[in-house]
Amino acid sequence: MAAKIRRDDEVIVLTGKDKGKRGKVKNVLSSGKVIVEGINLVKKHQKPVPALNQPGGIVEKEAAIQVSNLALFNATTGKADRVGFRFEDGKKVRFFKSTSETIK
């Protein structure tokens, strides 16, 4: 099945503590989750690793967020938009449902 949200897409968060925030997709996980730049930040307590000369402390990093809590951001309308699929020149492409504009 083709993915509606892919790496380097700009997405907007629909629900949760980061609702309304926009970010770029860094990684898509096979478990139906996505890691988005600057979204769903968590604090990780890290032990020092002297062998690697790594200091310990509290590190802030992005945690995975469910794909169902995200929507693709449409730059022409400035809003979240739904994604559809269609065939153009024998290739399957994604498009925005509201404007019928092809994505990338």
UniProtKB/Swiss-Prot annotation:
Entries under SMART domains matching the protein: KOW
Signal peptide residues on this chain, from the entry's feature table: none
GO function terms (MF aspect): rRNA binding; structural constituent of ribosome
Sorted UniProt keywords: Ribonucleoprotein, Ribosomal protein, RNA-binding, rRNA-binding
BP term (GO), one: translation
One Pfam family matching this protein: ribosomal_L24
Cysteine pairs bridged by disulfides in the record: none
Keyword presence, Transcription regulation: no
Nucleotide-binding is among the record's keywords: no
GO cellular component: cytosolic large ribosomal subunit
SUPFAM superfamilies from the UniProt entry: Translation proteins SH3-like domain (SSF50104)
Function: One of two assembly initiator proteins, it binds directly to the 5'-end of the 23S rRNA, where it nucleates assembly of the 50S subunit.
The family this protein is said to belong to: Belongs to the universal ribosomal protein uL24 family.
Cited PANTHER family: MITOCHONDRIAL RIBOSOMAL PROTEIN L24
Subunit-level organization: Part of the 50S ribosomal subunit.
Protein name: Large ribosomal subunit protein uL24
Organism whose genome encodes this protein: Yersinia pestis
Organism lineage string: Bacteria, Pseudomonadati, Pseudomonadota, Gammaproteobacteria, Enterobacterales
